Amino acid sequence: MAVEYVCCSPNFFIHIAVIVFLVLFAGLMSGLTLGLMSLSLVDLEVLAKSGTPEHRKYAAKILPVVKNQHLLLVTLLICNAAAMETLPIFLDGLVTAWGAILISVTLILLFGEIIPQSICSRYGLAIGATVAPFVRVLVFICLPVAWPISKLLDFLLGHRRAALFRRAELKTLVDFHGNEAGKGGELTHDETTIIAGALELSEKMVKDAMTPISDIFVIDINAKLDRDLMNLILEKGHSRVPVYYEQPTNIIGLVLVKNLLTINPDEEIPVKNVTIRRIPRVPEILPLYDILNEFQKGLSHMAVVVRQCDKIHPLPSKNGSVKEARVDVDSEGTPTPQERMLRTKRSLQKWKSFPNRASSFKGGSKSKKWSKDNDADILQLNGNPLPKLAEEEEAVGIITMEDVIEELLQEEIFDETDHHFEDS
């Protein structure tokens, strides 16, 4: 039979104080269970490194506590259960049995669950950082019971993995943080566009950004730099002009327009007598990030895009004779992941196998090392045979550094000449 205490006696006030403490303690444990366990380690690490000064301080205090999440969870639940189970014992000395059950359920539901979880779900970071030392003490006290249970949970469920975003999810998250989304984000339209372009660039290939061969301005290596050709080059407004041999699709090099400033048009100097730089040839399936990395090395800011096709394979016929079949290697069919990886590896090998490339860019400064090997990328025409496309290759376009940057920005880049043509 429960002991009843007379109102206003010392034991009565002690029981009231204990009941209030148990309700508040249970509410704190319930709120921390929701507040701390809802904070992922990734979010806390981001706040600790790049949050506001206040959030950095909070995250630094919470991170050591929540690293062992199963141990923290078991500790909070044990403390919460102990407080809720003890509450009816002290209420039983003040009211009847049914009254103790009714009051304890009401107090726990209202002040031990609803209100604490509502507060901690919104201010969990600040509250968790404030009571972090107290939580450490609770973990130490409950360690004999909580540690074996947490290890069992680690064995059965494994450690909680970091909640990282996939590219599509990260792009959507960035869009939500833009000020155009109307959700209170601070990112401008240009910022969200560039970030989205950087995320999408890994899925794009050279053929998605190149200029088709039919839209390219090229000059013949045997042409003469007379006044008409010089005026045409200046009118196009390009800094680099591709040079072809025999047919426009057989692009063998490029001419820097700035190197033509000292040439007198009246002398009609042949193009082959000026400095012609080598131009790399890259497959159309080369990822844009790979060619961007090659462009950044400074070897060339322009490359010829080629397509592997028309390989001839002999096929036996019914009468024993051999027929020829042409196979388009770069068909539009969806390649398997293994094929895609193999194609990328071949693409990089083809870029790296470009003849006479300077190999001094594996590290360090590019200026002095490049000046020593500058002649290696100049096309030597002193009796040497001019390069030609292989039989199984077909030039389909030209790609420049500007094309890749446009895909990254997802906007067209215009210079003075482009605006001149648009206005006219």
UniProtKB/Swiss-Prot annotation:
Highest taxon in the source lineage: Eukaryota
Any one annotated GO CC term: plasma membrane
Topological domains annotated Cytoplasmic: 33-70, 116-136
Keywords: CBS domain, Glycoprotein, Membrane, Phosphoprotein, Repeat, Transmembrane, Transmembrane helix
Location(s), subcellular: Membrane
Topological domains annotated Extracellular: 1-11, 92-94, 158-424
Spans traversing the lipid bilayer: 12-32, 71-91, 95-115, 137-157
Domain CBS: 210-271, 275-331, 355-416
Modified residues (Phosphoserine): S331
Domain CNNM transmembrane: 8-191
Region Disordered, residue ranges: 321-340, 355-374
Membrane topology designation: Multi-pass membrane protein
Biological process terms in GO annotation: magnesium ion homeostasis
Known glycosylation sites: N273, N319
Protein's name in the database: DUF21 domain-containing protein At4g33700
Organism in which the protein naturally occurs: Arabidopsis thaliana (Mouse-ear cress)
